[in-house]
Amino acid sequence: THTVWAFDGYTANPADYPAFRAVADFNTTHAAPGNTTGWFMPSAGQLWDVLEHLGGVKALADQRTNGDQEWYGTDPGNDICASLNRWLAHVTDAAKFGDSYNWFWSSSEYSGNVARLWRVRSDGYVYCYWNSKGISRDVRPVLAF
């Protein structure tokens, strides 16, 4: 998957992808440590790794070679939102994952108006599919060391 690392190099109109603009704005209001990449919107593959390893979604391990356009799976008994929140102990409650479900964008683009979107639920369901960039969903900026 492709990750757009720097807003400065993005040639499309940022208004066409509000999630990308949100990450650029986040960089201006939340200083990243100097020894990091700075905040960026992760690719679908990077989010896959976060969900599998930090969210404990074992069902993703079985789908690593799945080439489907859209994918969903279930990990019964895994409250994915709570699993992810355990890694967010030092952030405000408002910035944590909600109690029942969450949607969030990736930087993986299919076309000028479509990008990869993830949805996770507290009942163990996880979805990954393409959707219109104009839809209002959350974005989870990350940084790398």
State what each model feature region is.
Residues 1-40, 44-59:
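Short aromatic-cysteine micro-motif
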Residues 44-48, 53-145:
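C-terminal, surface-exposed recognition/capping segments
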